[in-house]
């Protein structure tokens, strides 16, 4: 053992103490600096008041302290208090097994937790806080960025002032905020407040998961009647929503591939598919089996009165009733018929049967040898 300095003390085998009142009191222990102390096997203390109290631990810096085996404290008043803990920086504190604190005032207080950055804090098991004043308090949580906060299990917050406070939630972007289970937000000040939702884009937010299998009042182009539509593949299978804006801010989603169109499809469709559906949604009007007009979804069929007819259109349940009436008084150029009966009077190819009725107001007929006029 070797001791150099006033009141230096080296009592362990191969121990070394150098400095005023230094102590190396275990085998292979080394203490360097006034009042430095190495009190465990293979421990090293370097700096004024540094203290290495556990086997193979290293304390470097004024008042640095190690209390865990194979731990390391580097920096003024740094502290490594558990096995294999590492504290680097002024006031850095790693108090749990295999924890790491790097940065002035950084603190890692849970198993395998890592805090990297000035005043960063990791207090959840296997959590990681990266950035000045970042916080990771949930198990397996990740907070990256100045003042980022991940406070629940498996939560991820990346970006300055980002916040993730729900299980399995992810917030990516400056001041992004997610508070619902398994929700994801990406973008500056994006917000996610509904479970399993995905919010994309700066200032976007998610809406409530309100899924209804029946749309009760779906109408097209302002038609007077409405259509009830039933959807397959919805309701019970819905897990969340994807938002790219909020109530006031909207975005286009471009270059979308054509989705499958079936009775059970849940694919997104693009503008060209909607255009074709709209274009083909009308119908043709024929005249004696010949197309004469195309009526699109916002078109109209107009029924007009004729010379001797009158059209009446009445509203029905998602339908219209069309009645064509013959006027009481009609005007025709000629009538061709094999038989005509008016009351008791019958006119046909065999002659006129007056039905025992008078024929009045007969004009004077011509009286001649070949006349066929009535007289």
Residue ranges and their predicted role:
Residues 1-228, 236-239:
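Periodic small-residue-enriched repeat registers in elongated scaffold domains
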Residues 196-197, 240-243, 270-273, 305-315, ...:
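Extracellular disulfide-bonded cysteine-rich modules/repeats
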Residues 203-210, 248-250, 257-261, 279-281, ...:
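Acidic glycine-/aspartate-rich tracts in secreted/extracellular proteins
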Residues 231-236, 246, 254-255:
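C-terminal accessory segments
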Residues 240, 281-322:
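Extracellular receptor-binding modules and their adjoining Ser/Thr/Gly/Asp/Asn-rich linkers
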Residues 242, 248, 253, 259, ...:
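Low-complexity, small-hydrophobic/phenylalanine-enriched stretches
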Residues 262-268, 368-371:
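Extracytoplasmic Gram-positive cell-surface binding/anchoring modules and repeats
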């Amino acid at each position: 053992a070797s001791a150099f300095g006033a009141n230096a003390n080296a009592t362990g085998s191969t121990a070394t103490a150098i400095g005023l009142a230094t102590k190396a009191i275990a085998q292979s222990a080394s203490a360097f600096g006034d009042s430095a102390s190495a009190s465990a096997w293979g421990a090293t203390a370097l700096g004024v008041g540094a203290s290495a109290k556990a086997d193979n631990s290293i304390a470097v810096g004024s008042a640095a302290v190690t209390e865990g085996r194979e731990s390391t404290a580097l920096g003024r008043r740094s502290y490594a208090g558990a096995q294999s803990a590492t504290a680097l920086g002024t006031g850095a504190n790693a108090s749990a097994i295999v924890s790491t604190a790097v940065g002035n005032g950084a603190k890692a207080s849970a198993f395998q937790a890592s805090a990297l950055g000035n005043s960063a804090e990791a207090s959840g098991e296997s959590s990681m806080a990266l950035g000045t004043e970042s916080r990771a308090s949930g198990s397996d949580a990740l907070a990256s960025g100045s003042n980022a906060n991940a406070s629940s299990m498996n939560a991820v917050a990346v970006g300055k002032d980002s916040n993730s406070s729900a299980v399995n939630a992810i917030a990516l972007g400056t001041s992004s905020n997610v508070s619902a289970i398994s929700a994801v937000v990406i973008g500056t000040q994006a917000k996610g407040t509904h479970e399993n939702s995905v919010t994309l884009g700066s200032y976007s937010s998610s809406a409530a998961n309100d899924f209804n299998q029946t749309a009760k009042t779906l109408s097209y182009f302002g038609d007077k009647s409405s259509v009830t539509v039933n959807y397959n593949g919805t309701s019970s299978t819905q897990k969340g929503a994807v938002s790219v804006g909020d109530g006031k801010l909207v975005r286009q989603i471009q270059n979308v591939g054509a989705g499958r169109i079936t009775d059970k499809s849940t694919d997104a469709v693009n503008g060209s598919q909607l255009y074709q559906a709209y274009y083909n949604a009308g119908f043709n009007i024929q005249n004696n089996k010949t197309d004469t007009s195309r009526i699109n979804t916002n078109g109209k069929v107009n029924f007009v009165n004729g010379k001797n007819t009158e059209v009446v259109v009445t509203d029905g349940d998602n339908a219209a009733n069309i009645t064509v009436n013959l006027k009481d008084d009609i005007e025709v150029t000629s009538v061709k018929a094999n038989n005509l009966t008016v009351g008791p009077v019958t006119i046909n190819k065999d002659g006129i049967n007056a039905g025992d009725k008078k024929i009045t107001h007969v004009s004077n007929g011509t009286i001649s040898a070949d006349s066929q006029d009535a007289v």
